[in-house]
A protein has these predicted regions:
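Short, Lys/Arg-rich, polar N-terminal cytosolic tail immediately upstream
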Residues: 1-4
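Metal-dependent phosphoester-hydrolase catalytic domains
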Residues: 6-20, 25-57, 67-68, 188-190, ...
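Membrane-interfacial entry segments at the cytosolic side of transmembrane helices
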Residues: 61-72
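Active-site beta-strand/loop signature of hydrolases that rely on acidic residues for catalysis
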Residues: 102-108, 123-151, 167, 212-217, ...
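Acidic/histidine-rich helix-loop elements
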Residues: 105-124, 222-259
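Active-site environment of divalent metal-dependent phosphoester hydrolases
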Residues: 110-113, 146-149, 171-175, 196, ...
Length: 370
């Protein structure tokens, strides 16, 4: 019996460790080439948990197997620190001064109309109320169409202290809105393959220095409300039929792969824009609709890796915890991100979970010029 237990611990530890390493580096794989294998990164949290459990079990029962999960964690450390950074000093209050630049990226979900607001003219609007209470310099808002009502609400509560506002409209219904304390010099629509999503750049004059804000709302998964509810039921163990679980899993995975292929092309277009402006202060932010262990994230974050100065993931650099920006229907993930070029240094970053007005939580980061 002891031999069976010992062998089982060895096999499970080995498989968990291999799975952790594979899922850690799945973001290098283009879904247009590697198809299903490129989605392995979505299983990273599961293999991380399994490896941690194996580490504890080996430490308590079979110390001679301890090296297996230990070395797996070492090999996967870059992905582990990306998924769960541990900068606990960042949990304190941010330092504010005239030399800092504080930016929020927030998918407002059409000013939360999709979150059960029956009256689009509901007052007060919870998204606008949340924004009005913030002390930030720049607001990068996705899914934020400026209707007469939303414009009036912003004018009444927000633009009194952040007086510059502009928008970029995509081929579909999606809108990027930027509200700034600093003058908006110009803007540029980023043209790429999309089904109703959008990216755009805004040039700001920040205390005499020109800074580019590249705001993004990348390809959505395209789940219907019914599919989201089916997935939630499956995650919470409410689906008992094997066929139901199989059908739901197949539908969800198929849509993730389809959207990932589109986002891969979008990410490559954004990486080209980033390289074209590598000598300018640049902030890249928005709703990427993808996780840190994805090709989308890897392509954008590594756009300048061949250069002397790479992009910095602000959350990874100074924050703590997994920082989930989406938590609905059994899905918990960090899919909203913010990067800065080497001209800027992040000093504080957090995901604000005090508001549930939208289906996303905003990410707020503070930087200083180097």
């Amino acid at each position: 019996m002891k031999k069976i237990i010992s062998k089982t611990i060895w096999i499970v530890s080995l498989l968990a460790g291999l799975g952790l390493i594979i899922t850690s580096y799945a973001g290098w794989l283009n879904p247009n080439t590697w198809s299903w294998l490129s989605l392995a990164g979505y299983a990273f949290p599961l293999f991380l948990l399994l490896t941690m459990v194996c580490l504890v079990i080996c430490a308590l029962i079979r110390k001679r197997y301890l090296l297996v999960p230990f070395f797996a964690l070492i090999a996967a450390y870059p992905a582990v620190s990306l998924y769960f950074p541990l900068h606990f000093a960042a949990l304190g209050d941010p330092v504010t001064s005239d030399s800092t630049l504080t930016v929020i990226s927030y998918n407002t979900y059409n000013w939360s109309w999709g979150e059960g607001v029956k009256d689009k003219n509901e007052k007060p609007n919870r998204v606008v109320e949340f924004l009005a209470a913030l002390d930030v310099d720049v607001m990068c808002l996705q899914e934020s169409p400026l209707t007469g009502y939303s414009t009036n609400e912003l004018n009444r509560q927000v633009t009194k202290k952040l007086q510059y506002i502009d928008t970029i409209h995509g081929h579909g219904a999606s809108t990027l809105t930027l509200i700034s304390r600093f003058p908006i010099v110009r803007k540029q629509f980023i043209d790429y393959d999309t089904k109703g999503n959008i990216s755009g750049a805004f040039w700001l004059n920040v205390r005499g220095r020109e800074v580019i804000i590249l705001s993004n709302h990348l390809q959505t998964m395209g789940f219907t409300m019914g599919e989201r509810e089916d997935f939630s039921s499956m995650v919470h163990g409410e689906k008992e039929s094997r066929n139901e679980i199989k059908n739901t899993s197949h539908t969800i995975a198929g849509k993730i792969l389809s959207a990932s292929k589109i986002r891969a092309n979008q990410a490559e277009a954004l990486a080209a824009f980033i390289r074209d402006h590598k000598n300018e202060p640049l902030i890249v932010c928005g709703d990427f609709n993808d996780i840190p262990q994805s090709y989308t994230y890897h392509t954008i974050s590594s756009a300048l890796d061949d250069e002397a100065d790479a992009l910095t993931d602000c959350y990874r650099a100074v924050a703590a915890g997994p920082g989930f920006t989406y938590s609905r229907y059994g899905i918990r993930a960090r899919i909203d991100h913010m990067f800065c070029s080497s001209h800027l240094e992040p000093i504080h970053c957090r995901v604000d979970r005090t508001t549930d007005a939208s289906d996303h939580y905003p990410i707020i980061c503070q930087m200083i010029f180097r």
